[in-house]
């Protein structure tokens, strides 16, 4: 057989742009939409006039001080690709400011008695953030664009409501809502200590009771959470949570769980703003939600259901999940820098500063610097990009079309913006994910399934793909042709040249391989027939209006396979939620999406893994794995390596390399273009403190790892 792997030293030509650029990335999973109340909210009114900013303060030095929980940014600048003149990274500071101050908006509310004084709103030990470039001034509005109720990640990413979070480098776990954590030597017992005196955005206390409410009344409730999240299990048993005090939560696992703290910092766990619409998120505003939960409502389930039906919902669980979804329900208290004032179901999704936010800068100014965030609904991506070209947005990377780069450059002075490329190491754009469990789905057909699960067949498809054409037509030639294991500049790269024969255009070898698989017969149109005589047709399922032109890219691949291989194809283009539904039900044979970098292969395994029930490659096998059943062949090896990495922190790095090698060796996904700009960020010229470039990943929720609460507008909105 042709499937032999060559190993060797390979020099990879990198882009000579001074930086490595990237595009508009997708999210790891399709988002669900929570039903809105019957009456649609009116568009948000324009924010109030900006309060006068305090006198400008001297810019802080660009050398970012070292903290206990993060490396000094300057030590990592070169590794991150930061060049001379680039903004350094933000970091946490151990030095508590001698005094604290607040925005004029919060000061006015405190003076009017509508909120407590600042000292009663901040925790005893606030999170202290050293901005990347300079101490900022208060005021202004962050204008953005969004595409509708399924675009929740548009603001979930910058708001990072996780108990712990990552540094800008995307690897170092650091404090956030929680100020510290511990683990025993066996990695079976953990504690997380919250900041004392934390407040929700409505002023109520945030304590471990909010974690235990989620554990006991949400995760454990089958109506809200029929299947507890995979991260909350160890050795087939749920983790045990114990509140040791108002500030200290203890977590015990049946087996060693060395990856748990990293997962808590990542989007996998996150908080209710990110995960609340699905009943997940590790904590929840118990003081608010108890009024909708039958465990706390007089009359129990019957009364809770009656209240839900009166509000237009089928049952209490659906109503409860809506109430816990802050993007759709502005009443829901939040722990983020800004709080929602106008829901995501409106034509204008609006937020305002949270005067109870727990973070300050190194001079004691309560964050965030900007007062408001206003996102205008764009009817489609073309409209959103036209608004960005015209300079209507303050900072916008999401949904920006790289193919319009020349137009953006031409209009940058007129629109008063600059352009940054935020980089995601080892990112695959428009990968082709073959569903190895399609034969187990509702439309599965054994003969075709036998080819989809055959790595030689996938290798032939890969070698029949003309990647250079895809790169030039859709990505301006800014991407690179290669696979996941090509030796790219990535700290998690296996360091071997694995499976790269399969990403080189080689139609002769591909056709010989297909012939050897019994696909040597063709119809009158030159399309290959399966041994039964039925024509082999591969259906490509794609989401429309979702980050990349998946419809166009896959249409090109289908035509390439027809011409180069005699493999017929069909394009199934659906709105994103419908596309996601087809994947969930295992109806899709092949779907196209990005991969969020090698670093996320184990932390967020939905792209490359076979252990996530919402993943792309083998959903049913992932469900089996959650029940202790391993798949056969390479997928079973992937699952065992994953399990070992989760339990044993020392095995993590080596296993991370090996699992991606398995993807490369078995040609799933089939990569098309690698390492293109992930976010082409359009940024007003007077915005400060945005790292350049900002390392990008899904698991660290970029732009959240750039600490947007420290971004500020010199001279206000322009």
Segments the model singles out, each with a brief description of its role:
Residues 101-102, 107-185, 216:
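N-terminal lobe/hinge region of extracytoplasmic solute-binding protein
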Residues 10-18:
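Hydrophobic helical h-region of N-terminal Sec-dependent signal peptides
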Residues 2-10:
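Bacterial N-terminal signal peptides that target proteins for export
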Residues 133-157, 177, 260-269, 442-448, ...:
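A structural "hinge/loop" feature
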Residues 24-96, 106-108, 166-169, 182-183, ...:
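Extracytoplasmic/periplasmic ligand-capture domains
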Residues 484-488, 684-686:
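Outer-membrane beta-barrel and related beta-rich outer-membrane complex signature
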Residues 230-317, 690-693:
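Surface-exposed binding/hinge segments that line
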